């Protein structure tokens, strides 16, 4: 021992003693040592060595020898002895069933409570162990497997047995003599027989397992258990060993190793394996003689048990830190092995020791018994449940498959673009099937990619599912009924809402100005209307003042949505047609909007004061569109007017009022307001502003309103003449302030009495709108990732980034719709931002980062925006007429196109002579047309065959080099790469020029 500190287990190896013996000596010498891994000083080690010389010859050698015959591990020895003692007691109690093995050991155990008698039974028990050890030693795993298998099949009986088994330990505790202890556990008679036979085989296989199990239970065991283990080891050797057992108090230190064995036997008893009983009994009877064989090989195994003990002690320390429950499943198997080993050990001594610790085994045995039984059951249940669950899951999957096949729809409705996942859900098939089907057709898609209606239809039809497309609802169709059943009792007449529609420059706004006696048209940029105007007019009719609300819609083709929106909310439509221009495309569109909205139509033939006016031609053209004038036998009212001179305006107003009376226009003013957004914009000083048309109810300042997905509380209302009003009745249009955001034109609004409900409704709608926008954005992308990469490699991918700011929401939608109509095959338009309001510095920053141009329509620049744009080099274009805006954007797109290289002919010449010069030849030519220019391209033709294409390297007239030769002159043409000139050849001179391409080409 050269080290300053010496470990207990090193000392035990040096002295050839067991760790527990060294610990006993330490305790007697008052040396502080808790476990085999504890360290002591060299002086203490010398004291222990001196004491060990007196102490060791009896205890350490004998327990080791005993452990060797019973099991190859020392740990198994004490376990076997204790178990044997307990099992013998059980054998006595349970003698009737296993009569053969039990009677011989019983008298020996009872009479010699002293250690001497236990030795003969040990020999008998060990004999059967020898047979099993010899046979299963070769097939150790097999011997282990059979006990575990029987445990699994009878989980229920095992549950019943454990409760009875914990009870028996109590009676042995009460009895002081070892014999009564044997009588105590009678219910375990079956298990002792089993354990006695398998004990020899299991110690070999389970030694490592027993170690781990001991470690787990050794932590919870009490010092009494250690005493029992020591007692077990002593009885097997001669009587002096029993005398050594007297120092039981010091043995509590051995608890770490020994108590584990004691705990396991009760647990195993509780488990009791019925299947092993009969076989074990037979083995015991037949194999009593081979015990000496087992004892003989034990001496060479001395080294191994020490190592095993050390390992067990180390594992025990680790087990203390770990959770006991985790290793309990292993303990179940080890418990059975321990029971088997215990049958062979000296039962009387074990019984006496176990009696001293009865209360602890109860709690310990009771607690582990339940988990052990449960653990035995759990694997079986899990395996059974797993198989059953697997079968059930498979059956469920089969059912699902069957259901899917059965539920596969025969017809589906496609009204929009769908993602692959949505289409799969609709068709009740797997997404991978759709992806495979498209891949086979040469279309590579992802599960989240959006498919257009045509592709979705193709996929559905390929799966033999019919596709139906719902009827398209016209944009002008009225989809919402503003009147409720509750309004029927409070209905009153309301003014008619009249929408003026027609082709651009046919005089719509001028007609309205004449009626209102205002000058609106003069204020319009370019003299054309570019957003809806709402005005109310008071008219004298039948000695009463009647009110009419007019909506003026744009006539330009870009404002189709505005015209549809106007027709949707109108009661009467006035179609203005210029008498000198006739029916135009927007005239036809206005007629279709009026028919879709189902509103009566009045035709105002304008500009009848012009000399070239021809009202009859207008009536003829309208009749071809299904509008037959009343004077021609039809039902369409046609009124000739002159907006500029005010001719026959009264007749037009009278017809409007007559039609409104026939239509019976009513509303309930005594309810919360409902209506439609005519226009919306972002004002730099007032914030979001919306023009609302009240179609039912009364709108008041302070109302909580939800416009589409926008919530707001009305702060102010302004009528068409700029005056503030406190309330607005049905059919009136007002501007409101106080919205949280700019709503979309055409959205319907509703007033709520509770602000909380209004906010919740707005949030829900905002979420729906967001999903719709995302889907539209995905479906509207004309460039996919695959096409982008392909075009980028070919240098064909070009994009024009635009930031669009407009005065009102309606104009914004019109411009975006017009941009979509532009050809975008080679140049894509990317609208990074489109919003109403003025151009801000934030817009400039976005444009600078993305290389976009800013387009402002009827809007202004915020303070600092112009300076920021100049600093960042951002181009800001301002427009007030949509024609110019669209033309400039188209020009910008064409500017991104690569110019086209075309061939431009210069002239032709005929070869009339060939002159050899040096190594080559010179063609003497006569210029027939155009001119020949040096360093331009030429093409040599001989008959219908092209012989050569190259450059004109030299051009001479007479002997002087010239740059060009005009028609009618002779010249010499030389080409370094062509000398095969012949008279009669035709030389064509041309050059390649770059021409700007257009979007159409």
Swiss-Prot record:
GO MF annotation list: GTP binding; GTPase activity; translation initiation factor activity
Outline the segment boundaries, as ranges, of region: G4.
Answer: 606-609
* Subcellular location, record wording: Cytoplasm
**Which residue intervals make up region (G1)?**
502-509
* UniProt-listed InterPro entries: EF-G-like_DII, IF2_II, IF2_N, P-loop_NTPase, Small_GTP-bd, T_Tr_GTP-bd_dom, TF_IF2_bacterial-like, TIF_IF2
Which residue stretches does the UniProt record annotate as biased composition, category Basic and acidic residues? 67-80, 212-230, 238-252, 395-404
> Is Cytoplasm included in the keywords of this UniProt record?
yes
Record carries keyword Membrane? no
Instruction: Output the Gene3D superfamilies linked to this UniProt entry.
Output: 1.10.10.2480, P-loop containing nucleotide triphosphate hydrolases, Translation factors, Translation initiation factor IF- 2, domain 3
Function as written in the Swiss-Prot or TrEMBL entry: One of the essential components for the initiation of protein synthesis. Protects formylmethionyl-tRNA from spontaneous hydrolysis and promotes its binding to the 30S ribosomal subunits. Also involved in the hydrolysis of GTP during the formation of the 70S ribosomal complex.
Q: Name it.
A: Translation initiation factor IF-2
Gene that this polypeptide is encoded by: infB
């Amino acid at each position: 021992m050269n080290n300053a500190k010496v470990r207990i287990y090193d000392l035990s190896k040096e002295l050839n003693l067991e760790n527990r013996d060294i610990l006993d000596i330490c305790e007697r010498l008052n040396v502080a040592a808790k476990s085999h891994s504890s360290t002591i000083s060299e002086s203490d080690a010398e004291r222990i060595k001196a004491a060990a010389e007196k102490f060791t010859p009896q205890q350490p050698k004998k327990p080791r020898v005993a452990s060797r015959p019973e099991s190859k591990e020392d740990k198994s020895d004490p376990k076997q002895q204790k178990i044997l003692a307990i099992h013998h007691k059980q054998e006595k109690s349970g003698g009737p069933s296993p009569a053969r093995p039990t009677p011989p050991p019983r008298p020996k155990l009872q009479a010699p409570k002293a250690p001497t008698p236990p030795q003969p039974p040990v020999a008998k028990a060990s004999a059967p162990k020898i047979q099993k050890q010899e046979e299963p030693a070769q097939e150790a795993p097999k011997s282990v497997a059979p006990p575990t298998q029987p445990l699994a099949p009878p989980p229920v009986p095992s549950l019943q047995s454990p409760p009875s088994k914990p009870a028996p330990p109590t009676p042995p505790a009460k009895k002081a003599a070892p014999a009564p202890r044997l009588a105590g556990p009678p219910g375990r008679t079956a298990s002792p027989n089993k354990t006695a036979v398998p004990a020899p085989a299991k110690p070999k296989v389970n030694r490592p397992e027993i170690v781990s199990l001991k470690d787990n239970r050794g932590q919870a065991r009490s010092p009494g258990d250690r005493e029992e283990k020591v007692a077990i080891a002593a009885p097997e050797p001669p009587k002096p060993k029993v005398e050594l057992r007297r120092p039981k108090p010091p043995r509590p230190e051995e608890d770490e190793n020994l108590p584990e064995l004691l705990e396991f036997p009760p647990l195993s008893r509780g488990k009791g394996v019925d299947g092993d009983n009969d076989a074990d009994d037979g083995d015991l009877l037949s194999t009593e003689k081979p015990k000496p064989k087992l004892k003989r090989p034990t001496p060479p195994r001395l080294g191994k048990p020490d190592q095993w003990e050390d390992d067990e002690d180390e594992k025990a320390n680790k087990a203390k830190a770990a959770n006991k429950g985790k290793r309990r499943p292993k303990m179940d198997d080890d418990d059975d092995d321990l029971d088997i080993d215990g049958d062979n050990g000296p039962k009387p001594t074990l019984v006496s020791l176990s009696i001293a610790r009865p209360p602890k085994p109860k709690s310990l045995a009771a607690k582990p018994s339940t988990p052990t039984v449960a653990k035995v059951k759990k694997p079986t249940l899990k395996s059974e449940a797993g198989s059953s669950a697997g079968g059930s899951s498979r059956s469920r999957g089969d059912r699902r498959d069957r259901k899917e096949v059965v539920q596969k729809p025969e017809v589906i409705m496609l009204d929009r673009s769908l993602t692959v996942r949505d289409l799969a859900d609709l068709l009740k098939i797997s997404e991978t099937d759709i992806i495979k089907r498209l891949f086979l057709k040469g279309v590579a898609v992802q599960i989240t990619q959006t498919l257009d209606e045509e592709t979705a239809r193709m996929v559905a039809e390929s799966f033999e599912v019919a596709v139906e497309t719902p009827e398209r609802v016209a944009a002008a169709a009225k989809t919402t009924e503003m009147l409720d059943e509750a309004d029927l009792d409070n209905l009153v007449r309301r003014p008619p809402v009249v929408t003026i529609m027609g082709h651009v420059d046919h005089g719509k706004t001028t007609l309205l100005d004449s009626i209102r006696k205002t000058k609106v048209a003069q204020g319009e940029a370019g003299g054309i209307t570019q957003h809806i105007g709402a005005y109310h007019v008071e008219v004298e009719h039948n000695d009463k003042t009647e009110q009419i609300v007019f909506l003026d819609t744009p006539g330009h083709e870009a404002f189709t949505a505005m015209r549809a929106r106007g027709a949707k909310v109108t009661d009467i439509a006035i179609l203005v047609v210029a008498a000198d221009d006739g029916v135009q495309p927007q005239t036809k569109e206005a007629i279709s909007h009026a028919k879709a909205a189902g509103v009566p139509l009045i035709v105002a033939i304008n500009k009848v004061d012009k000399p070239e006016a021809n009202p009859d031609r207008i009536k003829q053209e309208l009749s071809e569109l299904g509008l037959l004038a009343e004077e021609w036998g039809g039902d369409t009212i046609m009124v000739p007017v002159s907006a500029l001179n005010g001719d026959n305006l009264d007749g037009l107003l009278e017809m409007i009022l007559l039609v409104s009376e026939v239509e019976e226009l009513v509303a309930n003013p005594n309810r919360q307001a409902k209506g439609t957004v005519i226009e919306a914009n972002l004002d730099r000083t007032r914030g979001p502003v919306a023009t609302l048309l009240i179609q039912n109810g009364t709108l008041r300042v302070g109302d909580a309103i939800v416009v589409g997905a926008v919530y707001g509380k009305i702060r102010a209302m302004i009528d068409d003449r700029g005056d503030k009003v406190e309330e607005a009745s049905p059919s009136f249009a007002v501007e409101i302030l106080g919205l949280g955001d700019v709503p979309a034109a055409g959205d319907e609004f509703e007033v709520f009495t509770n602000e909380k409900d209004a906010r919740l409704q707005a949030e829900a709608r905002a979420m729906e709108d967001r999903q719709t926008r995302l889907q539209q954005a995905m479906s509207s992308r004309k460039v996919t990732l695959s096409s982008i990469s392909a075009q980028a490699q070919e240098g064909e991918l070009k994009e024009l980034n635009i930031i669009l700011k407009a005065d009102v929401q309606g104009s914004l939608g019109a411009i975006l719709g017009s941009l979509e109509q532009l050809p975008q095959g080679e140049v894509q338009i990317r609208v990074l931002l489109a919003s109403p309001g003025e151009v801000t510095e934030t817009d400039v920053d976005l444009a600078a980062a993305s290389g976009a141009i800013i387009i402002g329509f009827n809007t202004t620049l915020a303070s600092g925006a112009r300076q920021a744009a100049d600093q960042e080099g951002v181009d800001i274009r301002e427009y007030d007429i949509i024609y110019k805006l669209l033309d400039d954007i188209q020009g910008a797109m064409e500017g991104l196109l690569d110019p086209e290289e075309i061939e431009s002919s210069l002239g032709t010449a005929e070869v009339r002579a060939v002159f050899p010069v040096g190594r080559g030849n010179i063609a003497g030519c006569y210029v027939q047309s155009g001119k020949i220019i040096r360093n331009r391209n030429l093409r040599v033709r001989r008959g219908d065959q092209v012989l050569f294409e190259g450059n004109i390297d030299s051009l001479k007239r007479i002997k002087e080099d010239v740059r060009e030769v005009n028609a009618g002159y002779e010249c010499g043409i030389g080409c370094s790469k062509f000398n095969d000139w012949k008279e009669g050849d035709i030389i064509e001179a041309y050059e390649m020029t770059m021409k700007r391409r257009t979007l159409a080409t």
